[in-house]
Amino acid sequence: MIIVESGPLEEMKAHVVTTFPDECCGFLYGAEQTNGSRMISTILKVNNSKTGDKKRRFEISGKDYMLAEKFALENNILLLGIYHSHPNHPAIPSEHDRVAALPYFSYVILSATPGMIDHIRSWKLNDETQFEEEAFSPTHLNQSI
């Protein structure tokens, strides 16, 4: 299970709003609990460095990955995953998302339409490099932003 504290959750939602209709992205930081769940306490927004159609794809630069690792070390916090938006599409990873995914990370996807976050879901790669959904708290938002 992945649990996102209210502050980081609001930051992610605001990031989606300000970049809509393009995809946005960022890093998820926090702690792993003894029961295996992940508590997200901090996010780090990054620019979508994708050239071309940012409405359907996102890309995080190598430099941003290095800065993300540095941020984790400097703040004594774990880098646990990545979030990104799916404007006008479901919160289900695409094949492009799967190919670009790294093991261990949680991938939180925010499905958005104009002025609304429809769903937030989280995914992790299994041993066969396929996405499996992980429980997310909360799972349905259906609230205006």
Predicted regions and their residues:
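Conserved beta-strand-loop surface patch within small alpha/beta domains used
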Residues: 1-79, 88-145
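Residue-level "edge-of-site" marker
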Residues: 85
